[in-house]
Amino acid sequence: MIEAVLLLGFAIPLWAKRVNQFPPGKEALVVHVVAQQFSFNYHLAGPDGQFGRRDALLVTNSNPLGLDPNDPAGKDDIVTTGELHVPVNRPVIAELSSKDVIHDYFVPAMRIAGDAIPGSLIPIWFTPLKTGTYEVICAQLCGLGHYGMKGTLVVDTPQDYQAWLKERAELSGGAQGAAPSPAPGGPQQPQPQQSKQPAPAASPSPGG
């Protein structure tokens, strides 16, 4: 009994320190994860490294994140729904938020989880160690369609990740094509996302 108490007494603070010790922003891939009933939206900065401005007043079905088409910083951004690609062996900082109710971003195979709460920005981080396709689910009851709130996290080789970024940019013309604004003369309509079936679970990554 004493041994168990001592183990927990040392392990919990060390694990908390590990989880909360975020990698430097320049080393990590920063992704904005915006949950909504009943899907996860992903927002990545383009080659300029800057995220475009978002405005709740611009949110529509075709522009789920409310990206401002007049903001130059967002012209090269990438927005996807349901599927996120990340490079293997590179830290990922996922900044979680929600448009409606409380959700929970959960990657079971990697033991990554974090709440997405309206009005809050909650960061979590992890380092994917193996390439593959992993299931993403919402672990918080969020409405009648909760059972179908699923997606995929694809861990690519660095080469495949760069190819995916190039493909997304060519298909959508940056975020302005993937998530257009209703303003006159705005960007193009979003391109359909290709879904992938989850692969067998891989060993979990540290952090999260």
Indicate where each model-derived feature is located.
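Non-transmembrane, membrane-proximal soluble domains of secreted or membrane proteins
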Residues: M1-G208
